[in-house]
C-alpha cells in the first residue's frame, strides 16, 4: 500500500463513487445489480444482531451505507441508525426509500474520518460492510470506526481477502461468468488480507471477537456463513471498556 496517506477529507476514490452513482437508481431493484447485497443482507443482519446482543434501542452507525439496505434493516430491528456515504445519488435513493418505507434513518454525506472528529464514542454499534476495498486508505477507516464506538461497543467489518481464489471467485466468477455484479466492481489489488485488517484493528482500542467467511454455492445458488475466509469474510471486534 502507498505509504503516503490521503488527507482525512480526501480518503475517497472518486472513480469508485462514480461506479455506484451510475447505478444508484437501481439500488432497491431485487433483480438488478445489487441483487447479491439484498440476498446476503439477512446473513449480515443476523450476524450483527447475534454478535452484538440485539440492536433494539442501540445507536448504530453504518459506514459506507450506499442505498441503505443494511441501514434500513437495522432500523427495523429497533436501532437508531445513521448512515454515512460519500455518494450523493445513493444517499438520495436511501432517503427516498426510507421515506416510502416509513423507516427513520439519518443519512449523512461525509467521510467516516470527518464524522469521527465530531462524534467520538457516540455509537453502540458501528458497521462497515464491503466498503474498505473501495477507499484509498482502509487503515484510516478502521481507526475512525474505533474512535466512533463507545467503550465496550461493537464494530463489524466485511471485505474480500486478497489471493488467487478470491480473484477467481469475486472478479472472474461474479463479474464475468455469473454476472452477479457489474464488471469492474472489484479491483483485486484493493482486497484486504485478514492479517492486514487485524493488524489495523490491533492499533486501536478494538479487539477481535470472531471472524467468519461468507460463502456462495453456484450449484445451489445459495449463500451461507461458515469457516474459511479465503474470499469474503466478516470480522466482529469490540472496543475495550473504559
UniProtKB/Swiss-Prot annotation:
Keywords from the UniProt entry: Methyltransferase, S-adenosyl-L-methionine, Transferase, Ubiquinone biosynthesis
EC number: 2.1.1.222, 2.1.1.64
Keyword Lipoprotein on entry: no
GO molecular function, one term: polyprenyldihydroxybenzoate methyltransferase activity
Domain of life: Bacteria
InterPro entries: SAM-dependent_MTases_sf, UbiG_MeTrfase
Catalytic activity reported: a 3-demethylubiquinol + S-adenosyl-L-methionine = a ubiquinol + S-adenosyl-L-homocysteine + H(+); a 3-(all-trans-polyprenyl)benzene-1,2-diol + S-adenosyl-L-methionine = a 2-methoxy-6-(all-trans-polyprenyl)phenol + S-adenosyl-L-homocysteine + H(+)
Signal sequence, start to end: none
Coiled-coil segments: none
Single Gene Ontology BP annotation: methylation
Pfam families in the record: Methyltransf_23
Pathway: Cofactor biosynthesis; ubiquinone biosynthesis
Alphabetical list of CDD domains matching this protein: AdoMet_MTases (cd02440)
Residues reported in the UniProt entry to bind S-adenosyl-L-methionine: 44, 64, 85, 129
Record family assignment: Belongs to the methyltransferase superfamily. UbiG/COQ3 family.
Function: O-methyltransferase that catalyzes the 2 O-methylation steps in the ubiquinone biosynthetic pathway.
Name of protein: Ubiquinone biosynthesis O-methyltransferase
